[in-house]
Amino acid sequence: MMKPIPKALPLLLGLGLALAQPSLEQAEALLKAGNYAQAALAYEEVLARDYGRLEAHLGLGVALFRAGRLEEARFAFDQMVRVFPERYEGHFNLGQVYLRLGKPQEAAGAFAKAAELSPSEEAYLGWASALAQAGQAKEAAEALKKGLTPERSPAYRLALAQALYAAGARAEAVPVLYGLLNRDPKAAEAWDLLARILAEEGLKARALRELDRGLALVEGKARARLLLRKALLSPSPEPLLREAYALDPSLWEAAYLLGRARLEAGDPRGALAFLLPAYRTSPEPEVALALAGAYLALKDYPNAYRYADEAGPSGLFLKAQAARALGRRVEALELLEGVNALEAQAFKGSILLEMGRAEEALGVLRTAYTAQKSPEVGVNLGASLLALGRFGEAELVLREILQAAPRMAAAWYNLGLALKALGREAEAQRALTQAANLGSAEAKALLRR
């Protein structure tokens, strides 16, 4: 008697196919041995003799899928659903293949049909996953709501809550999460999402209370995620982050936040001790950006450039800074074309000034200084005016800067140069002396002449 065909999750592991004739037996043996190419040929032979063999259609699709021949696997399962449109396995496996091919819309259609034929948990989860990948968060949540029954597992209920959250239905996710936690009080991910939602709804104190309830129930490494969430809501996060990281060193977010805190505290070398493990665990753009900042502070410009590049668009400014430090000014200017922040524009102006392109530098720096009145930018603006021989304008800008930052040596030095060029030697001497007293090597050298 023929054995029933089992469900295909993930893609029919342990097929247990019926043995109708030696060629089918041989195909199954080849599949179990991992000889997928030969198994596919054997299944094709069976189908050439009898295209109505369910087991051969199923086995062929699995063999091709495992061999990485996804388009052929898609065709095999497509044929299976045409010959056996009432069979759940074909539609479900076709959905799996479409997901691997990066075609979530087609996958959603296949999973929807599978769910219609057999309203299984995995079919609805596959359907929702495909819709989410297609950018249809609300539809994903609706699919899981449609498939919700009293016997659904905690994993299904968590997926539903996550889908509702992704769809912007935070309040609707809350009763789902409480229902899940009533059944499974040790579900750390549910406690985490519940606290996140409560905090986003403005109920921070309640979120912290729920996290404490969760921490009293959850055991082992799973506690780390709750400690991380509590740290994000706490005014003193570092002890909680350290506890979370000690519990679960693979929790890259905790390592990243610890590293970023060290970087902001002016300890770039200490930051690397956390940021490098975080990046090895999960090479996220924000971690790469923090690494670039740490290496830039340490004057390790090749590594700063590398990690800024890996950070993507958010790393363009740091990448430009590293490129300039490596002597690649033209590249730095090209990188800054895509960055509109005032800080980046001020940096662009300083590079143009270094390259002797004072007229271009003046336009960029004047815009940046007018917007922000930064003394550092103003010094470069004054330098560009000096380079263009506009000494009176330079004096006005530099005196304005010195009212805000009277101990800025570079401003006093540039003012001295402007006054000297205007023929006001006594005033120039006083300005240069002040610059020298504040540590300007250039002013000291000029005074010794």
Predicted regions and their residues:
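N-terminal leader/linker segments that initiate helical-solenoid repeat arrays
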Residues: 13, 17-62, 66-68, 75
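Register position in tetratricopeptide repeats
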Residues: 32-33, 66-67, 100-101, 133-134, ...
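Canonical positions in the second alpha-helix
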Residues: 45-46, 79-80, 113-114, 146-147, ...
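Short coil turns that delineate tetratricopeptide repeat
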Residues: 51, 85, 118-119, 151-152, ...
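Helix-start (N-cap) detector for alpha-helical repeat units in TPR-like alpha-solenoids
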Residues: 54-55, 88-89, 121-122, 154-155, ...
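Canonical tetratricopeptide repeat
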Residues: 59, 66, 93, 126-127, ...
